Regions:
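Short, charged/polar connector segments at secondary-structure boundaries
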Residues: 1-107
Length: 107
């Protein structure tokens, strides 16, 4: 698997029809508010055909906000199975973590 980072125009990006995650309206609203204030600071991940592997919500909000381009990590020379594994793993990682309540009190 080969990884490169590019700035891709919104028009070059392709939304995947196979995304396994659903983003509720409240999550979309919160993320949009954050991205308006801070910008989209995490690159999306795409395959060599610029189909989104990870970052559908960021892509949707970029469209909503009229953002012209996004930083993207392009995954090439990956098998279809590797792409599916990457998509599922990236979407699952945060779900499997817990907050450290003691540390949150100091933030």
């Amino acid at each position: 698997m080969l990884l490169t980072t590019l700035l891709l125009s919104i028009g070059e990006l392709r939304s995947s029809n196979s995304t396994a995650r659903h983003h509720p309206a409240l999550q979309h609203k919160k993320a949009k508010r954050l991205f308006k204030r801070q910008g989209i600071v995490v690159p999306i991940v795409v395959d060599e055909h610029h189909r989104i592997i990870d970052g559908h919500l960021r892509f949707q909000i970029a469209q909503d906000l009229g953002i012209d381009a996004l930083q993207a990590i392009v995954v090439s020379k990956a098998t279809p199975a590797e792409v599916i594994e990457l998509e599922l793993a990236l979407n699952r990682l945060a779900q499997d973590s817990n907050w450290d309540e003691a540390r949150l009190k100091h933030k």
